[in-house]
Regions:
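Conserved catalytic-core segment of nucleotide-activated headgroup transferases in glycan assembly
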Residues: 150-151, 157, 424-432, 436-439, ...
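Nucleotide-sugar-dependent glycosyltransferase catalytic core
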Residues: 108-139, 170-183
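Active-site and donor-binding regions of nucleotide-sugar-utilizing enzymes
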Residues: 265, 406, 413-574
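Non-catalytic N-terminal targeting/anchoring module and adjacent flexible stem/linker
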Residues: 12, 35-39, 59, 150-421, ...
Length: 716
């Protein structure tokens, strides 16, 4: 929509510069639900009403690509919107075609184009995927650059680079669904465009962070960034100018584990120099009480740096040291034989701040002293006194809750059990039902996040005394007092009553619990970032197959002693001797690109996107097929359809005429089924456990491989 008086303001201004420009732009403001309005970076250049020369390099980032414009009504200029089907760059091309005639643009500060970013039917999340437009986009970029017959004006470099950079950030640039040969060719085409851009187009872009700048420079064929390692100083130069310098490295502490007499620190090192160095040119060195040793490293998941693909190769590592006594730990980075110190910085799971100067994990107190991490073994009394003293740094309800939790933990041994709000129960429930029987002095509570209509069927009267509502004041107290947390779903939001890691910061020193990730299926989707040892809050993980052990160790970098090979609790409740009925279970998984995230861990289906998708069309064709119905009738078989909880509302959208195709409820007895059909559901391993046949049916395989879902590969 347009703000009042926008049209009059723009037309009045256009009349004053009519002979000078063919196009006048005005402010576009992006609105998204209740978030503050967002302004495009072009308004750092367009600061006042006037005419801007697009041949001037300082105006290269105006990048007029939307239709917040007013143009001359000149039917003879032959410039129209490109109406080619699925072109998707029609606004951008139209603006480019008009502006290149005079290389000038007018800007009027009055008026506003109000752009609703909260539109659930926006095409950005779907048809802007490279699955649909990579070839179209590249052809447009290449034709635009080639049309200049030589050096491309900086303004048009900025247009194309801006498209590349935001698509990389949103993971909408690279065509992952291509074959390896096609993918390599696609990357060469991108690099050929970068070759025609000035370095300033990359370095000076107002919306590209430091690490992305070095990623793009490292890809530019005619740019050769060089790392210069001097005594006490490290720098990067490109074509004779310095583009980075530092004398130390930021080292980000992610987690500290303490177990079996050892402390284990998990960290990664940040620096753009890793974009321009080979693996053999650097080392990570630990100094424990003055004794130095080189550490083994792996590529950190934080190498993506505000993207979905790695833009740099940050080294991550574990450093072990004794848990008893007192120890001083420092780290150094060696670049071509020269050592540089590190600055220790804390991440959410290992927080030091102005108010939190120490914390204790399993009997070991950690403090920071400049560039040194100091560890010291302490008993429960010293831990208690230190935490009470630290509470004095807080006020009001935070201080009150802290002190209550410190006192409660001192007198009680608390263990908590969780599933997720999207399911009635899972492995957290089964583990709770098993453990609550023990009389060992431990207080056990199942944290529930939905109301149960059949509570007496799920829990005995005694067990109901140990149910605590998620997010309640009692949950907060127990969470801060807990010694062990068992959860079927990873992350902070499924377990924390404070909503996020940020909400836990005032209490971070009190979170001295071990997290046992029970899982809710056998991990086989490639979720390297989400489930990595660096990101997933899990001290131990229950695994169910030798494949899973190798997968977690190799691809997710978990040490072997973090894995518990007992199998998921729910497998104890599967009767492998039960005879199957004449029924087939069809359980497709959900799709991120057909939903919207309401808040963390909560997704909502968008009906309009679902109904227009290949995912829905192909599933409908299958479920509504007369041939299928006849086959089911002929074999006296029923097909039960179990939709993922996130897309369960879609069951009313199918037009199924056969009584032999049945929409199943949230819970099914898998022993009843002779066969299982799915795309990626982890239920597949439950049927493997039963030794029942499995059939894969992926209705949108191309979109899946292109990365439109939240993963694009399987680890199988």
């Amino acid at each position: 929509t347009l703000a009042p008086d926008t049209v009059k303001s723009i037309v009045d201004y256009f009349d004053t510069v009519y002979d000078e420009v063919d196009l006048v732009t005005y402010r576009i403001t992006q609105y998204f639900k209740n978030a503050p309005p967002v302004y495009h970076f072009r308004y750092r250049t367009l600061t006042h009403t006037g005419v801007y020369d697009l041949d001037d390099p300082k105006n290269r980032f105006i990048t007029q690509t939307n239709v917040n414009i007013c143009v001359k009504n000149d039917k003879n200029n032959g410039i129209f919107f490109d109406e080619s089907p699925n072109f998707r760059h029609e606004d951008e091309k139209y603006c480019c075609d008009i502006l290149r005639r005079k290389m000038k643009i007018g800007f009027c500060q009055k008026g506003e184009y109000r752009y609703n970013r909260g539109n659930e039917n926006s095409i950005v999340s779907t048809v802007f995927s490279p699955y649909y437009i990579f070839e179209t986009s590249m052809a447009f970029y290449e034709e635009l650059f080639n049309s200049f017959g030589g050096r491309v004006p900086p303004y048009f470099q900025g247009i194309v680079f801006n498209d590349l950079r935001w698509k990389l950030k949103e993971d909408k640039l690279l065509p992952y669904h291509y074959s390896p040969e096609e993918f390599a060719r696609a990357n060469r085409r991108i690099d050929a465009l970068l070759k025609q851009m000035d370095e300033d187009t990359i370095i000076l872009h107002p919306s590209v962070n430091e690490y992305h700048i070095h990623y793009w420079l490292s890809r530019k064929p005619n740019c050769h960034p060089t790392v210069i390692a001097d005594d006490g100083k490290l720098s990067i130069a490109a074509d004779g100018r310095k583009i980075f310098s530092a004398s130390s490295f930021p080292l980000m502490m992610r987690k500290i584990f303490v177990e079996n007499g050892k402390a284990r620190l998990l960290s990664f090192v940040k620096s753009p120099v890793f974009s321009h160095l080979g693996r053999g040119e650097w080392k990570v060195i630990a100094s424990v009480d003055g004794e130095k040793r080189e550490l083994e490293t792996f590529t950190s998941v934080f190498s993506a740096q505000d993207s979905a693909v790695n833009v740099v190769d940050f080294p991550a590592f574990f450093c072990e040291f004794p848990a008893d006594g007192r120890h001083e730990i420092k780290f150094f980075i060696s670049i071509r034989g020269k050592e540089y110190p590190t600055n220790l910085l804390a991440e959410p799971t290992a927080v030091f701040s102005r108010k939190i100067r120490m914390y204790v994990r399993n009997g070991v107190m950690f403090t920071l002293n400049g560039r040194t991490l100091v560890s010291r073994s302490v008993d429960e009394n010293e831990k208690y006194r230190a935490e009470r003293e630290q509470s004095k740094n807080f006020k009001g309800n935070v201080k009150k809750l802290r002190n209550a939790a410190i006192e409660y933990r001192r007198a009680h041994k608390v263990e908590l059990y969780y599933d997720l709000h999207t399911v009635d129960f899972d492995n957290g429930y089964y583990q709770f039902k098993n453990d609550i029987k023990h009389s060992d002095g431990v207080e056990r509570y199942y944290i529930y996040s939905r109301e149960y209509k059949n509570i007496d069927e799920l829990f005995t009267k005694d067990e109901q005394e140990h149910l605590v509502k998620f997010g309640s004041e009692k949950h907060k107290l127990l969470y801060l007092s807990a010694r062990v947390i068992f959860t079927a779903f990873y992350g902070v939001t499924p377990v924390s009553p404070f909503g996020s890691a940020a909400g836990e910061v005032p209490y971070s020193d009190l979170l001295d619990f071990k997290t046992i990730y029970l899982q809710h299926g056998v991990l086989h989707a490639s979720l390297r970032s989400q489930n990595s040892v660096e990101r997933c809050r899990a001290d131990k993980i229950v695994i169910s197959a030798p494949f899973e052990k190798q997968n977690y160790m190799t691809n997710y970098h978990y040490p072997e002693d973090n894995l518990i090979p007992t199998g998921m609790a729910r497998y104890d409740h599967i009767d492998r001797s039960k005879k199957a009925k004449n029924r087939i279970l069809f359980a497709p998984s959900w799709r991120k690109y057909l939903t919207q995230e309401i808040n963390s861990s909560k997704w909502e289906l968008i009906d309009s996107k679902l109904k227009s998708s290949d995912y829905f069309r192909n599933f409908s064709r299958f479920l509504e097929s007369e041939e299928l119905h006849e086959l089911l009738e002929k074999t006296d078989t029923y097909l039960d359809v179990k939709l993922h909880p996130i897309i369960a509302d879609a069951e009313g959208l199918f037009d199924i005429k056969s009584p032999r195709v049945v929409m199943a409820g949230a819970h099914v007895d898998i022993e009843n089924y002779k066969m299982f059909i799915t795309d990626f559901s982890s239920f597949v391993f439950d049927f493997a456990y039963l030794c029942r046949p499995v059939l894969y049916f992926v209705p949108d395989y191309g979109q899946f491989k292109a990365g439109m879902n939240h993963y694009r590969e399987l680890d199988l």
